[in-house]
Amino acid sequence: MNYTIEKVTTLIGARRYGDKDANISFVLTDSRSLCFPEETLFFALKSERNDGQNYIPELYARGVRNFVVEVVPEGWATRYPDSNFLKVVGSLEALQRLAERHRDEYLIPIVGITGSNGKTMVKEWLYQLLSPQMVVTRSPRSYNSQIGVPLSVLLLTENTQVGVFEAGISQPGEMMALRDIIQPTIGVFTTLGTAHQENFPSIEAKCHEKIKLFHDTEAIVYSSDDEVMMQCLSQYDYKGQKLDWSVKNAEAAFYIKAIEK
């Protein structure tokens, strides 16, 4: 990514404190990962255990001059000269909004992968298959959370020809935000299992939440051997192409006759 600080301010709907010119090429949420301070925008995220604003003094001392915050530090103009503070209502929502606007710039195939297990494995398989012929941008490691997905999508560049991103959820209501950020054109539903089941009333409820990722995709790849997955898809208003794989049904789009280990 490459945006001026003015452009970022507009994209995330922030109020800007400071007038220092800056070009932003990197987004940071973890102070331990700082590499290029002058081109970095730090999002001070809050969690139950931590508050990103506590790291502003350290990051400023290390050269960072651009921050997204929910509360502007008292005396910022004298404590942090030559800096910009972008004030927002929610720092996580601002990060997600920036990624969503960044994704809007790319009219390319994007594969969105979800499921209880196997997301990272499938992503890496696709990368190995596609990268010899295409420039592929993919999620780093297992970046599939409410923070990891926007950080992944912000890696898209003008050279990217296809994106491959994971989307993981742990509770109801999370997938819509990830869908808006990834905006997949092709969907892959790996498996449906018990991971994070404690926050859902039933496995069917979790399935319905996960398939929201595929609402606007042109095609979805899934297992027709999974009865719950099949039931959820039949109840979902999905208008794209359904490409099922099976080890039982020879009529499936992809019939697996044998598996060699």
Could you describe each region identified by the protein language model?
Residues 93-224, 230-240:
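Phosphate-binding loop of NTP-binding sites
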Residues 52-65, 85-90, 183-185, 208-210, ...:
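A short, gly/pro- and small-residue-rich
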Residues 1-97:
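N-terminal leader/targeting and accessory segments in enzymes
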Residues 16, 85-87, 110, 136-138, ...:
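Conserved beta-strand scaffold positions in the cores of enzyme catalytic domains, especially
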Residues 68-76, 224-228, 247-248:
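Short, polar loop motifs at secondary-structure junctions
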